Amino acid sequence: VTGCVNNSNMTSAGNSKSGIAGENYGTVRKSENNGDLSNSGNVGGITIENRNGKGQALLFIDDYADLSVNGEISECVNNGAISGKYDVGGIVAENYSCGKIENCANTAEVSGSMTGGIAGRASGCYKKSGIKNCQNSGNITAQGSYGGGIVGELINGLVYFCENTGDVNVENCNS
């Protein structure tokens, strides 16, 4: 997926919501979300899940998705307010299984339980995945226990050359 733009506000009571792609096992590049997204589950400005999908089936697709095995998001921007109940990120709700996020930015407010300016939750394999050269300037509010300017919860992943200038407010103590 390259050069896609979402300008629509979306609110639903379903499980997950994103501006560009549901689950990404491919590449999303130079895409932008400008719409406010709100949902009772996981929410990501660009995708819900980003992962390396070697041999896995694509389970569900939002508006635009590409099936391959890369799991890469690059040069994407979120400008819309993002709110959800669980994993919530300005770019992606969950970054798993060697997924890469590079050169992306979030400028909007993000709120949820496990909440980050770029990713709500990130885990993967060392040296093969991570979040690189990303910026967050939006304010982060974690109603649960994990919140961060870049990632809400990081397990076995890498974050490098990233910058947060937004405020981070966490209601519980795991920040």
Show where each model-derived region lies.
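Predominantly extracellular beta-rich ligand-binding scaffolds that present long acidic/polar faces
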Residues: V1-S175
